[in-house]
């Protein structure tokens, strides 16, 4: 009988096959089974191999037909199969990780080259912060100047508004004075018209009185003439007393003198009254004329001043409009400059923040790559130890032919112990390998998320 062991996984004893010496193995002929005798075969079996005519009876120990109780749990065998599958998956993953590590090492070398190249360059070329600070300082200086100019323009505007208010008050006063003067002028014109009418009436009365005086003179003269004619033509016989002498001519002369005195007095009184009225009207007319002339001159002066004030008001209004337009333009320009500076500052801050984030991301990637590299180095060292142990185990003989049942059982037990030892080693090494693999999977999942 010969015992052949099959090593599965880490040289674990999975089955034991017992075949007769004379019977051929599966897939071989009977003559192929008779080769160099090994230790443990009897002389009878040896002669049977060489003599085809006599085949000795094979005696089998019944104890060998009893299944060998190796005290192996099926769960342990299932666990070993599972470990074998995991080992295959880990080997595949290890191969992919090696490729990724090589790619990452190339990328790391490229990044280190770029980093050293960037560090070797002149920092002033890429140092845009100083330029941005200078530009921001200039913008702030311009903003400060615009604010000062705005304050000055506002002060000038207040002064101009005060002057405009003062001119408006003066203009309103002049308008009120002009209205008063116009009203006074109208009143004076009415008085002048009334005085002219009154003067005309007085002149008419004077003329009527003069004509009346002339008429009275004429009447008196005519009456005197008539009376003289009557006295001359009438012959009167008067018995006179010689004792009483009457002087009629003296009486007539006296009456005539009285009439003449009355007429002269009436004429003088009328002339004096007319003269006084004329002088009074002339004085009043001269007074009214002088006041009218002064009013006209004042009105002309007021018109000139009003025209000047209007022109000044128009110029002040145009100046105010120009100042308001300048203020509005300055405000718009200042607002645009401020918004532009604000936008550029925000862009610079965003660019700086993005650069910081990129730098932090590169540092994190570099750190993660270093961690992955360290983990892969540990994993490679672990796999190297496992491979070296496996190679050392595979260099030792894998099958032994025993001559006795007791020695074969001991050999099988020793082999089972040897197979358990690498299994325990594998179990002990399973933890860090799986942990490192999980770390690698976690890193590559993070890398795929970052790339997306």
Swiss-Prot record:
Region (Coil 1B): 136-227
Chain spans, region Coil 1A: 82-118
Renumbered residue ranges of the record's region Coil 2: 252-390
MF GO annotations: structural constituent of skin epidermis
Region of interest (Linker 12), ranges: 228-251
Keyword line: Coiled coil, Intermediate filament, Keratin, Phosphoprotein
Similarity-based family: Belongs to the intermediate filament family.
Quaternary structure, from the entry: Heterotetramer of two type I and two type II keratins.
Descriptive protein name: Keratin, type II cytoskeletal 80
Organism: Homo sapiens (Human)
The organism's taxonomic lineage, starting at the top: Eukaryota, Metazoa, Chordata, Craniata, Vertebrata
